[in-house]
């Protein structure tokens, strides 16, 4: 699910935090990619085109086709991907997973009704809703990546949290996922649409964590509380509070505890035994592998291994697989050009650095308001101190 309404809220209140670019803009960058999100995209994309690639036994192979050719495209554009796979979900996610199971059951019933009625459009719609990434899909994708010479990481828990840890440790430039909670986990850069197909012509949308904090006028802890109010995977949200009201409450009261002390409970219903504190801690201290100890290596592709893995039962064209392997080899040896900014060391962002920048911006804003008040004869309207 990610964070409900966060993307639009940032676009409305902190547009300077979003930049749209072509893929080639990220030449020379290392990027941590949410593998499960990619595999899901690949599985549903082929369905939407009216075909399901499969082995001779009927097992789907569209996830492998997508992973193979999309990864080659990234490397062709000078991007060095590292795929991060989900581990076990946190206990707090059990409620969200139960809701997904209910929606899946409803989709199965709707699919049966559509099939009985012969409604092709509805059949396709509910078939897509029933697509899910399995452990076998992930296992096959890892084997493929190893043969391609592309690194992957097994996260102990949530992939987005592990991606964010890699970014904060300076191992990669950004997290690539469609789930906005990568920002809540503290990824300083988030890339959306990076793994979309070229045919969709979607520019890559880059979110800057520091700029969104500045635009929303919050620090990192307040941003986490905002995301919990908006709606996340780990606890319920307060009914009746939408994005606009959520940011107003955070700007006025700065944390959920103070919001609850001042909330009009005749208007808003707070969930019983609300686990927002545990959800907050999960975002602050997620279960991740030590990013500083992770060694990312891009190696030579195994052409014969790729042919053996993808052809035969999986029915990939040997000619196309060998051409793909040649592109992998070429990209591995062609990246001699470097980004100018790679000559300068960029220190990872810290909460103190973000808060210092925020204080500086507030002081400048306050100074400007005071000058305006003196010239107009009126009083400047201040904000509640943090």
UniProtKB/Swiss-Prot annotation:
Mg(2+) 2 binds at residues 179, 181, 233. Binds 2 magnesium ions per subunit. They probably participate in the reaction catalyzed by the enzyme. May bind an additional third magnesium ion after substrate binding. Residues 354-386 are annotated as: Disordered. Residues 336-344 are annotated as: Interaction with PCNA. The keyword Nucleus applies. InterPro entries: 5-3_exonuclease_C_sf, Flap_endonuc, HhH2, PIN-like_dom_sf, XPG-I_dom, XPG/Rad2, XPG_CS, XPG_DNA_repair_N. The keyword Coiled coil does not apply. Residues 122-253 are annotated as: I-domain. It is found in: Nucleus, Nucleolus; Nucleus, Nucleoplasm; Mitochondrion. DNA binds at residues 47, 70, 158, 231, 233. One of its GO terms (cellular component) is nucleoplasm. PANTHER family: FLAP ENDONUCLEASE 1 (PTHR11081:SF9), FLAP ENDONUCLEASE FAMILY MEMBER (PTHR11081). Structure-specific nuclease with 5'-flap endonuclease and 5'-3' exonuclease activities involved in DNA replication and repair. During DNA replication, cleaves the 5'-overhanging flap structure that is generated by displacement synthesis when DNA polymerase encounters the 5'-end of a downstream Okazaki fragment. It enters the flap from the 5'-end and then tracks to cleave the flap base, leaving a nick for ligation. Also involved in the long patch base excision repair (LP-BER) pathway, by cleaving within the apurinic/apyrimidinic (AP) site-terminated flap. This is Flap endonuclease 1. It comes from Drosophila pseudoobscura pseudoobscura. The gene is Fen1.
